[in-house]
Swiss-Prot record:
Keywords, in A-Z order: Cytoplasm, Peroxisome, Protein transport, Thioester bond, Transport, Ubl conjugation
Function per UniProt: Receptor that mediates peroxisomal import of proteins containing a C-terminal PTS2-type peroxisomal targeting signal via its interaction with PEX7. Interaction with PEX7 only takes place when PEX7 is associated with cargo proteins containing a PTS2 peroxisomal targeting signal. PEX7 along with PTS2-containing cargo proteins are then translocated through the PEX13-PEX14 docking complex together with PEX21. Acts as an activator of the seryl-tRNA synthetase SES1 by increasing its binding to tRNA.
Record-listed cross-link Glycyl cysteine thioester (Cys-Gly) (interchain with G-Cter in ubiquitin), residues: 5
Protein's gene: PEX21
Species: Saccharomyces cerevisiae (strain ATCC 204508 / S288c) (Baker's yeast)
Protein's recorded name: Peroxisomal protein PEX21
GO biological process entries: protein import into peroxisome matrix
Cystine pairings recorded for this chain: none
Length: 288
């Protein structure tokens, strides 16, 4: 048989395997076989394997031997020189710089870092036992200097200081409420003058005259109770009682010499109707 028509079954198997690998839908990492080792291997073992395969067809061990011989040795694989190491991107990635316009400034980051460290220090002091503070004085010493913001934060963490602050705030709130409901006339004008004193004296006398004296007799007590019940419904007596107690006073005009209205000293509201002064004159034309 001429050498041109001679076809080795081993080469057919290898070519078919290469064709299947190239046409596969799932790509795999291809490795290079040492061409010199394969050529020498097939040149020396080709004739021997063919004879063994043809003459021992009934023996299946021959096929297994051929299959085992076709498996390449792990030593025959060589790694291409153009591959890149997987760890080469680490220094390049760490050296990258990103210019973010929304990033905080370095001064703000430094201040915030100091703030967080101070918070951790305060929390650790709160959980520290008292006896350890007495024995180890160095572990409980405070820093020599603090900023104003850190001092305020430390004062908030102290429950005693917080309680004192709440008490002072309540006192201040009561003073503000007292000034808010105080009438403006009391602060701006000298409302308790001679006219007001005279009006209060007259109102007190009226209330005393309309109040029956206490008596032990049953008939007089019944009469006094009926009079008191009638007077309690009188708006005039109620007004006199308010003037006598100082709850209602005169509201002076802008000149401060005359008064035409009454107002409540508790809430500043007007009491009753405005007094309209009428001159006491006699017209001669009417008499004529």
């Amino acid at each position: 048989m001429p050498s041109v028509c001679h076809t080795s079954p081993i080469e057919k198997i290898i070519q078919q395997g290469h064709r299947i690998q190239n046409d596969s839908l799932i790509p795999s990492k291809r490795t290079k076989l040492a061409h010199t080792e394969l050529t020498a291997h097939y040149a020396t073992e080709d004739s021997h394997v063919e004879k063994h395969f043809l003459h021992n067809g009934s023996n299946f061990d021959g096929i297994d031997n051929v299959r085992y011989q076709n498996q390449p040795s792990p030593l025959t694989f060589i790694t291409p020189n153009n591959t890149v190491d997987s760890s080469d991107w680490v220094p390049q990635f760490s050296s990258m710089k990103i210019d973010d316009s929304l990033e905080f400034s370095s001064e703000y980051k430094r201040l915030y870092s100091n703030y967080e460290s101070q918070q951790r220090l305060n929390s650790s002091r709160q959980h520290l036992p008292f006896k350890n503070c007495m024995i180890r004085k160095t572990s409980c010493t405070y820093p020599p200097q603090k900023t104003l913001r850190q001092q305020r934060q430390g004062n908030r963490d102290n429950p005693t200081d917080a309680f004192q602050f709440d008490a002072e705030f309540q006192v201040l709130e009561r003073e503000i409420q007292k000034e808010r409901y105080e009438p403006i006339t009391r602060r701006d004008e000298k409302w308790f003058d001679q006219d007001q004193s005279e009006l209060q004296r007259i109102a007190t006398d009226i209330v005393k005259c309309c109040t029956p004296p206490p008596s032990s007799a049953s008939s007089s007590s019944t009469l006094s109770s009926s009079v008191e019940s009638k007077l309690s419904e009188s708006k005039f007596i109620q007004l006199m009682r308010n003037i006598s107690s100082g709850d209602v006073t005169l509201k002076k005009n802008a000149d401060g010499n005359s008064a035409s209205e009454l107002f409540s000293s508790n809430n500043g509201e007007l009491v009753g109707n405005r007094h309209i002064f009428v001159k006491d004159e006699i017209h001669k034309d009417i008499l004529d």
